[in-house]
Amino acid sequence: MKTLLLTLAAATIVCLDLGYTLKCNKLIPIASKTCPAGMNLCYKMFMMSDLTIPVKRGCIDVCPKNSLLVKYVCCNTDRCN
């Protein structure tokens, strides 16, 4: 019985996410990745010439400022990009 309880406890610890980790979409939205520590935002980058198709997605620590050529959209929830 003790072995069963220890096994269940170990499985629970392994399955739990003990620290919050953000998941962001990669370039293809069906694929996501877990962001490393310190990267607490997801982003999409668009070329200003075509705001309908993102050219890059991923994790980032600070949302960059938009420029004349590039627009960034940042968010902070799982797979929000």
Swiss-Prot record:
Superkingdom in the source lineage: Eukaryota
TM ranges: none
InterPro entries: Cytotoxin_Cobra (IPR003572), Snake_3FTx (IPR003571), Snake_toxin-like_sf (IPR045860), Snake_toxin_con_site (IPR018354), Toxin_cobra-type (IPR054131)
UniProt GO MF annotations: toxin activity
Signal peptide range in chain numbering: 1-21
UniProt note on tissues of expression: Expressed by the venom gland.
The keyword Disulfide bond is annotated on this UniProt entry: yes
Family membership: Belongs to the three-finger toxin family. Short-chain subfamily. Type IA cytotoxin sub-subfamily.
Subunit structure: Monomer in solution; Homodimer and oligomer in the presence of negatively charged lipids forming a pore with a size ranging between 20 and 30 Angstroms.
Function in brief: Shows cytolytic activity on many different cells by forming pore in lipid membranes. In vivo, increases heart rate or kills the animal by cardiac arrest. In addition, it binds to heparin with high affinity, interacts with Kv channel-interacting protein 1 (KCNIP1) in a calcium-independent manner, and binds to integrin alpha-V/beta-3 (ITGAV/ITGB3) with moderate affinity.
Name assigned to this protein: Cytotoxin I-like P-15
Annotated organism of origin: Naja atra
